[in-house]
Every structure is written in C-alpha cells, then in structure tokens.
Amino acid sequence: MKILVIQGPNLNMLGHRDPRLYGMVTLDQIHEIMQTFVKQGNLDVELEFFQTNFEGEIIDKIQESVGSDYEGIIINPGAFSHTSIAIADAIMLAGKPVIEVHLTNIQAREEFRKNSYTGAACGGVIMGFGPLGYNMALMAMVNILAEMKAFQEAQKNNPNNPNNPINNQK
C-alpha cells in the first residue's frame, strides 16, 4: 500500500524551531523513523514524503492523490490547521482515509491553535506525542486500510451482493 505523508509550513525547520515545544528531531529524522518502523514491522507500505510552506501546494498534492495509487494520507498541516478551510475542503474531496498529526498537543496551547479546520475533515487526529505520533498515525492507517480491504473482499464474495460475478451468470 502506498501512503502519502504531507508536511506543512515550518516543519522543515524542526530541530531548530523552539526545541522546548518540538524537540531536536529534524523532519528528515522523522521520515527515517517512519521508514524504520515500516521495515521493522515488515509492513507492505511505501511512503512518499512531501513538504511545503505553501497552502496551495498542499491542496495541489491532495488533489493529485485523487484517482492515484495512494491509498491514504497522513498530514501535518502545521499552522494551516487553524486557518485553512481550503485544505479542509481538499481533504474532504480526497476520497481516501486521511489522518492529521501534530507534534504538540494543540489543545494545550494558545487559544487560536485549539481549533483545527483540517482535523475536523480528517478521519482522526493524533497530537501531543512528538515524532511518535507519525508512527501512531502510520499504524492506524495500515489497520484502517486493511479493514477497508477486508470489507471490500467480503462484499465482493457476498452471494447477496448484486455486483458479485456469481449473480451475473446466466
């Protein structure tokens, strides 16, 4: 399964940006940790990473995923979480599971950070666990996609399903 990981504004500055809040781990190190998690778990997962500081590029990337071989999206929209209805709309149009990740617990921060338009559009939000949150999102995504595939397989094999090829034989 192929999963797109989208990183928003200022995440390229991890390791330098307010280490008291975000720690010393860089974005590249977070991506390496995710790749290691995939390898150690022997998961059949291909990760693609994308980082931008521009709202429109995040929207473009989500839209590009529509009809592609990406099965899910893990996104940290950064501060756009609190301001971007446009990214939230793109998430709702993605047609695939989307999980939002935040390194910090946005509910424990400034009042203006407590609302997440993008989080409301996602299937779930993981926050406050630092870099571990990305592996938590990855684990959740793998399980969600496995459940979806199992459900689709069960539907396909259901003799009462009008789309079952057995029911179309004459």
Swiss-Prot record:
Keyword Lyase: yes
Catalytic EC class: lyase
Active site: Y22 (proton acceptor), H102 (proton donor)
Gene Ontology biological-process annotations: amino acid biosynthetic process; aromatic amino acid family biosynthetic process; chorismate biosynthetic process; quinate catabolic process
Binding site for substrate: N76, H82, D89, L103, T104, R113
Keywords: Amino-acid biosynthesis, Aromatic amino acid biosynthesis, Lyase
Site note Transition state stabilizer, residues: R17
Keyword Amino-acid biosynthesis appears in the UniProt entry: yes
Pathway info: Metabolic intermediate biosynthesis; chorismate biosynthesis; chorismate from D-erythrose 4-phosphate and phosphoenolpyruvate: step 3/7
InterPro entries: DHquinase_II, DHquinase_II_CS, DHquinase_II_sf
EC numbers, comma separated: 4.2.1.10
Annotated family: Belongs to the type-II 3-dehydroquinase family.
PANTHER family: CATABOLIC 3-DEHYDROQUINASE
Function: Catalyzes a trans-dehydration via an enolate intermediate.
Subunit and interaction comment: Homododecamer.
Protein name, as recorded: 3-dehydroquinate dehydratase
Lineage of origin: Bacteria, Pseudomonadati, Campylobacterota, Epsilonproteobacteria, Campylobacterales
